[in-house]
Structure formats: structure tokens, C-alpha cells
Amino acid sequence: MNPFQKNESKETLFSPVSTEEMLPRPPSPPKKSPPKIFGSSYPVSIAFIVVNEFCERFSYYGMKAVLTLYFLYFLHWNEDTSTSVYHAFSSLCYFTPILGAAIADSWLGKFKTIIYLSLVYVLGHVFKSLGAIPILGGKMLHTILSLVGLSLIALGTGGIKPCVAAFGGDQFEEEHAEARTRYFSVFYLAINAGSLISTFITPMLRGDVKCFGQDCYALAFGVPGLLMVLALVVFAMGSKMYRKPPPEGNIVAQVIKCIWFALCNRFRNRSGDLPKRQHWLDWAAEKYPKHLIADVKALTRVLFLYIPLPMFWALLDQQGSRWTLQANKMNGDLGFFVLQPDQMQVLNPFLVLIFIPLFDLVIYRLISKCRINFSSLRKMAVGMILACLAFAVAALVETKINGMIHPQPASQEIFLQVLNLADGDVKVTVLGSRNNSLLVESVSSFQNTTHYSKLHLEAKSQDLHFHLKYNSLSVHNDHSVEEKNCYQLLIHQDGESISSMLVKDTGIKPANGMAAIRFINTLHKDLNISLDTDAPLSVGKDYGVSAYRTVLRGKYPAVHCETEDKVFSLDLGQLDFGTTYLFVITNITSQGLQAWKAEDIPVNKLSIAWQLPQYVLVTAAEVMFSVTGLEFSYSQAPSSMKSVLQAAWLLTVAVGNIIVLVVAQFSGLAQWAEFVLFSCLLLVVCLIFSVMAYYYVPLKSEDTREATDKQIPAVQGNMINLETKNTRL
């Protein structure tokens, strides 16, 4: 039977090759050499692209820097909802590059795609800024505007991601491949410069400027929006200087159809009646031209190498989550400068700005002079190893922190701290329901202690009997407690005798390097205490206890206090990182109020500087892996599919974020053990990647052109040539 003839069931085994598809590609017209920057190999158009990328990254990272706080304090979402939406937005930003690449390669081309999606990007910033104006509607409207804005921003930033880097690479002639390689380093430099500056500036716009009596989120979102407008204007200004390769048809659809046809054709002919073919994609030769099949082969070869890569991003992206939470339990006082926990991640773009020229101009050149073939894939493998080491160091730091962290009571346990506000020493005996002794402790008057005693209960809730011996007096008080809580027993004067009150304590270190304070008012007048931006704390008279209030670390020499008829000042002194304080207001003097200061939970002692080694390692890993990966993706992509491959590279970042969410949600491990788990997983992935890369044969510029005129070389497996020994890891 003729293989090109329909059978009785009207199923087509093979489709005839159209005359148009069999024709060779028309020769390209001679290219005009674009103007260069100061006689270098860099086209002038590159300057517009790099400035555009700097402004766009400033816009993105600046908005993202204050996004979580916006969710928490403006929309009043809880931490779980805020975290979920934040990571969902981040993942969406790395999934949409597939759409942008498809539009660029099959419809509009890279230039128009960048222009149009940048307009969508700007519109998203407009919605986001409007959603941060307090007087504009209620919470529902703010939420809708915010989610619409974030969706448009994700579409805009994700859609242009694969296009901008590849469009910059298009500006170079083939003979300037070395300059193109350096361009990707400059491009990555612009990304991190924008990230570094915006991460410093936008939190200042939010916190230091007040809008409608609160933090100015509208300004913090509006300024990044203006930077995106500037990015669009700068990019459009270079329009006449750009080389604009036209789109080469519906590439994504062609690739999918080609792969599908090859698989179906191979499956239909699995009986072996027809001769075997050198590669499974060769089964598409009856319908698709050889140059397309060769391009798809080159694409799948690189995509196969991409399979292990998400694990690297799973580690790298934890700088903004797990590592920040780790910094939250450390002391940010560096002596000459006080560093907040969420500011530590600024170290990454700062080090990138140093490491990129250091690696390009010094380290790589020294390795080259030693005649070591340090290829792109080898750099990426070394980057993975450095990331493994970074997380091993993070695990060591975490174990050190665990030795200093404030413990939490378990089931049928409570922690009890005794504070003596009486004039003399008091002996405290705590008895259980069966009069069994749970605690015997002597406490000096106004003794400053951070000591908590662990008491074992007989049930989840229980009444405890407190026997207080003061001079010759014995006082008995009963208090109810519940398991897994921390309590403070406050002993105070009651005329000639003493009494006690049991106050539930948080027992938890304040988040984000803040200090937590509360007050006990022994005066006979109600007291209002003003702590800067928040509403005054009200403390009732005669041993009234205030709620906790978190404040920034710093000195508070003159806190405003007032009763119904007088105004006073109160010196709180230095409030330190992660410390919980109790202030007992004892009396009024001519200088103001006097208070006794006690630390419930001690200061974070481990310096945040101990995170420096892990940041150095992970940043070096990023430079070797990410910068190299950008250039590798471009150089190994067929000319018709460069944006598609760039989008696939970014897609590995999205998958990496999902890995973090899954492991963090279901591992149930201690934090140090989770760090070790990630380190070991990446080490295994690195070994697999190294084996895959050993057999990888790099794509040469003439490979796909030659494929249209001669037989496709023998390649086996998943596009890994097992016959050649000309390997390049």
C-alpha cells in the first residue's frame, strides 16, 4: 500500500510534504553593521536595553519589597494568606514567560511584545497604586484592585522576561560572540543594581512618608510604577537602532505539533515493518521540514538538561523566606550600623555587583590561563555545589541559634516566671491539685530575671495553689492555668501584706527584630502611654496590665505619658532585638515617671554577621549558575526559538518555588534539618546534572543549517550522543 494513500479506515499514516515546506530558506540579505559604543563590539542599542532592564527590575523588586507588609497591615490579611498570595504571585511571574515567548516568536516579534506587554505592566502598577489609597473605597475594592494589578504585573513582567534578554543578544553579529557573552553579565548586573537600589528606597517611601495618617503604600507602589514608565520610554527611544528579527511563524505550535506527530507516527509503526530511524523526532520527517526537526532536536536537547535545574532555584529563592526568618532570630547590631532582618537579603544583589566583574575579569581568566576548560555547564555544576555548601552553613547557623532560642512548653506543661514587686524577699511554693510540690523558689525584691520554671500539669487545665511567705506572713492564692502557655506571677504589696496576680505571657520572641513591651501601672491613676505612631496604650490604675506593643529596636529616652490631669515623660532606655520587656511604673518624681525594667525574654545574642558566609556562597553560586545559564540558553537555542528557550529557563524558577512550598508544607522537619535536606537534594541533582552534561554535545551555529541539506547525525536516547567522546561538561 502506498504510505501516502488513505486506508479504508481513512486514517493517514503519513502526510505528504508540501512543495513550500521542501523549498530551502531564502538567503538573508546582507546585514548592516549597527553603530558601536566607543569603537567597542557593543552596539549602541544595547545601552537602551540595559537601562530598560535596570528600570524594570527597580519597578518589580521595589513593589515586591513592601508587598507582604501591604497584605498584613493595609489589607489586614493574616500571615498565612499573605504568604500564600505572595508566593502565588511570584510563581505566576515565572510561568507567564511561556506566553510572552509564544507571542514574540510566533506573532509580534520581540520588540513589539516588549512594548505592548510593558503597557500592560504599567497598567498593573496603576491598579496596584489605586488599591493602596485608603480613602478610595473599602477593603473589598482595595483587594480587587490589588489582585487585578498583581495579575497584570505578573503578565507584564513575565511576558517580557524571555524577550528582553534574547532581544539584547539579537543585537550582536555572530563574529562578536565573546562580546555577547559579556553582555549577559552586564545584563545581569543591571538586574541586581535595580534590585539593590529599589530594596533600599521603597521601604523608606513606605515607612518614612505618611499618607492619610499611615504608611504610604500608594507612594511605595507609585514610584516603581513611574520607573516602569521610564523603562518603556527608554526602550522605545532606541527603536531605530535595534536589529528586529521578524517572528518565524507559530513556533510553539509547530514544535508541539512536530513532537506530537513524531510520537504518534512512531507509535503507529512500532511493529517494525518500517526501518528504524536514528532519532525518535525523525519520525516527523514525512510532514515537517528537516530544518524544523533539527531545531526541535536542539531545543529538546537543552530542555532535557533543564530537568534538574529547578532544585537550584528552590534553594536560591529561600533568601527572602527561610533565611530572613533565620535572621529574625539573630542580633543585627553591627556596632557601626544596625541591620534589620529583612535588610540582610540586600546583601545578595550587592555581592552580585561585586562578583560579576570579579569572576569575569579575574577568576575565569586565571582558570583559562591554567588551560582548564571551564565550560558553561561546568560553571553551572560548580554553582550547584556552592549552593549546597551555603545551605550546609545555614544549617550550622540554625543549630547555633537553637541553642539560644527561648523554648516553648509542651503538652501538660506551662512555663512560670516569678516577679517580686514587694518591698522584701518572698518565698514562693506552688502546689498541684494533690498538694504535690511543683515549685519552690525564693525571689528577691525587684529581681531582674529571665528565668522561667517548667511546671508539669495533671491535665490540660488546672488550678494551682500558690503559697507566699513574706516576712512572718503567709498568703495563699489560687490561679487557673492552661497547658502550652507561659505565665508571670506578679507579687505586689497589698497594704501591710502581699498579694499576687497571674498574667499570661506571650513566651515568643517578637518577629522581624522588633522589641515587645508592656506596662504594669502601680499608680492610683489610669495612664495613657504614647509610642510614636500607634494609638496610646491604656493602662488601668492599681496594678493594671497593658497589652503587648512591638516597637523598633532603639533608644526611647522620653516616651509621652499622661494621666487625666498631668503629662509625664518616661525613659525606656535601649530596647533590643527580639527582647520582651516588662515595665512596672512605680512612682512619680520631678523628672517624670519612674519604672522598673525587666527582661522577660533575653536579647538575640548571635550576630547576624554569621549569615555572611552563606550569603557569599549562595551569591557566588548564583553568578556561576544564573549568569552562565542565561548565556548558555541563548547560545544553544536555534535562531527561531531563542525566546522559547529563555522562557523555559525562567519556568525552572517557577517550579523551584513550588518545590519550596511542597517541602516546607509537608516535611515536618526542624529548620536545620530542612536546610540539610535541601542541601542533600541539590547535591544528588548536581551529580545527575553532571552525568547528563558529560554526554551533552553543544550546538554549533551551523548545525541546524546543515541539517536541511544532509542526513541527521546518529543520536540516541534523549538527545544525548553516546557515541562521541567529544564531550563538554
Curated annotation (Swiss-Prot):
Residues the record lists as Phosphothreonine modifications: T12
pH dependence: Optimum pH is 7.5.
Keywords from the named record: Cell membrane, Cytoplasmic vesicle, Glycoprotein, Immunity, Innate immunity, Membrane, Peptide transport, Phosphoprotein, Protein transport, Symport, Transmembrane, Transmembrane helix, Transport
Keyword Metal-binding: no
Reaction(s) catalysed (UniProt annotation): a dipeptide(out) + 2 H(+)(out) = a dipeptide(in) + 2 H(+)(in); glycyl-L-leucine(out) + 2 H(+)(out) = glycyl-L-leucine(in) + 2 H(+)(in); glycyl-L-lysine(out) + 2 H(+)(out) = glycyl-L-lysine(in) + 2 H(+)(in); glycyl-L-glutamate(out) + 3 H(+)(out) = glycyl-L-glutamate(in) + 3 H(+)(in)
GO CC term, one of those recorded: plasma membrane
Record's protein name: Solute carrier family 15 member 2
Organism: Rattus norvegicus (Rat)
Species lineage: Eukaryota, Metazoa, Chordata, Craniata, Vertebrata
